[in-house]
Amino acid sequence: MRGGTVLLILILLLGVIARSPMTALAAASILALSYLGWGGLLEWIEQNGVDTGLIMLTLAMLAPFATGKVGLREVLLSFASLPGIIAVIGGVLATNLNKRGIDLLSGEPQIIVGMIVGSLLGIVLFGGIPVGPLMAGGLTALILQIYGWLSK
């Protein structure tokens, strides 16, 4: 058994134990594609998966506008409130962290295993919700940068 297969099986098991269906399903899907010999699809997922996932997430965030659950009035009112202004600042900070996460993951893809384990521990110990590796990667990059500053 290849090392990558062993890691995927471990991630699958951790996902099941931690009751994280997204993690378990992702690991099981990649294992299945690998065993079916669908290397081309695996390569496509590796190259385009993050962008495709972000598109799906953005679609989910924009859907309330199309369904009429959120209108222009609500959006404008949110910008006039303290929570709305803080939400804009939070969005700016989050996108910056997410970019750092993508940069870290593309430069050091092996770090994803630690982030997955950390995410699963967050689910089990703190009732967290796994939203993917970007925020975990961004926070990891920020912590590594702070560590770099402090260790000089």
Swiss-Prot record:
Sequence intervals crossing the membrane: 6-26, 52-72, 75-95, 111-131, 132-152
GO CC annotation, single: plasma membrane
Domain of life of the organism encoding this protein: Bacteria
Keyword Transmembrane: yes
Keywords of this entry: Cell membrane, Membrane, Transmembrane, Transmembrane helix
Compartments in which it is found: Cell membrane
Recorded topology in the membrane: Multi-pass membrane protein
Keyword Phosphoprotein among record annotations: no
PANTHER family: UPF0756 MEMBRANE PROTEIN YEAL
Family, similarity comment: Belongs to the UPF0756 family.
Record protein name field: UPF0756 membrane protein Helmi_09930
